[in-house]
């Protein structure tokens, strides 16, 4: 039996999934992300631990796929730039191959998550999808005709940095009005905190006690209790998110837009008004084929499934 590993490298933790060649996920683990000088050793040691735990010979490992945040050159295996992990021109594939002689492929983490959803999640019945993650920022991956769109040197598909509001909020990238400054979970809570300060009678004060304590759960509790301030903030959030998704739908005309990240799991409170707005705004409207709006099936495991798909040499 041949085995493969899918790795999803995050800013605080690394997820590792052990797969059989039959697509079965047989075990997974998480371990803390340390600075880059420790990264390869940490990955290697956890690979050994995982194989020993499952009584599998390391020689049966036929491939490793890695999703890594930032600008990643999949052809050379080099992390060109990763702000989250402070890694510049980091040859992670070369260093890991010095320890384990197997096929290794790497790509941007959001692209890899899209590949996972395409092969094993809600995208498996389609050939064209746009996968959008709503978290600390806005990430995403694009599958066109069954292939992952990475752009030159793997630097493409940075959908969180398309501008939806000229001279809008300042983004960490240095531009103003980027999609992620409006549609991320961070943006939603930022706006809610400002509104909370300006509205001392809002239920947000009763539920969260202070702006600093306001988070996703407390915000959505206020929304469920029909707090007026939370409702106004969320309606504006839907509009901003719909603006960006409409741009993506008009450019790529995918079979489906698939949303991941914690906010997407809120279900109908998000999806129903978002679908309605998209149908009104998409170019051609009722005269063009419907773009399906869906919630990720794989959720937090999309990255490891995509990394597995990438290294097991599937169509990509």
Predicted regions and their residues:
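ATP-binding/phosphotransfer module of carbohydrate and carboxylate kinases, centering on a glycine-rich
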Residues: 1-62, 73-76, 94-102, 119-126, ...
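Short beta-strand segments
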Residues: 8, 65-69, 131-137, 141-143
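Short hydrophobic alpha-helix segments
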Residues: 28-31, 83, 152
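A charged helix-plus-loop insertion that forms the helical arch/lid used to bind
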Residues: 77-88
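General beta-strand structural signal in soluble alpha/beta enzymes
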Residues: 104-108
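Adenylate-forming
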Residues: 114-119, 140-142, 161-162
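Structural signature of FAD isoalloxazine-binding scaffolds in flavoprotein oxidoreductases
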Residues: 155-158
């Amino acid at each position: 039996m041949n085995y493969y590993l899918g790795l999803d490298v995050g800013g605080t933790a690394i997820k590792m999934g052990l797969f059989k060649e039959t697509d079965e996920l047989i075990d997974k683990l998480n371990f803390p992300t340390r600075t880059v000088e420790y990264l390869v050793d940490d990955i290697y040691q956890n690979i050994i631990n995982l194989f020993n735990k499952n009584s599998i010979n390391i020689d049966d490992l036929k491939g490793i796929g890695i999703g890594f945040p930032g600008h990643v050159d999949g052809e050379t295996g080099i992390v060109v730039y990763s702000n989250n992990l402070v890694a510049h021109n980091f040859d992670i594939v070369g260093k890991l191959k010095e320890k384990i002689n197997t096929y290794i492929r790497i790509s941007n983490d959001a692209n890899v998550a899209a590949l996972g959803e395409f092969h094993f999640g809600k995208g498996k019945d389609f050939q064209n999808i746009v996968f959008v993650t709503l978290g600390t920022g806005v990430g995403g991956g694009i599958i066109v005709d069954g292939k992952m769109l990475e752009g030159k040197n793997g630097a493409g598909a940075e959908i969180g940095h398309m501008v939806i509001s000229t001279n809008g909020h300042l983004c960490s990238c240095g531009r103003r009005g980027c999609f992620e400054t409006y549609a991320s979970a961070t943006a939603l809570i930022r706006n809610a905190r400002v509104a909370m300060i300006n509205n001392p009678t809002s239920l947000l004060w009763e539920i969260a006690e202070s702006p600093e304590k306001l988070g996703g759960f407390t915000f959505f509790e206020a929304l469920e209790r029909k707090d007026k301030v939370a409702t106004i903030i969320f309606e504006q959030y839907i509009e901003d998110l719909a603006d960006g998704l409409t741009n993506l739908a008009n450019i790529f005309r995918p079979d489906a837009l698939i949303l991941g990240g914690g906010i997407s799991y809120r279900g109908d409170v998000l999806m129903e008004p978002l679908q309605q707005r998209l149908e009104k705004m998409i170019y051609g409207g009722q005269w063009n084929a419907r773009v399906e709006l869906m919630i990720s099936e794989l959720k937090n495991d999309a990255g490891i499934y995509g990394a597995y798909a990438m290294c097991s040499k599937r169509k990509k």
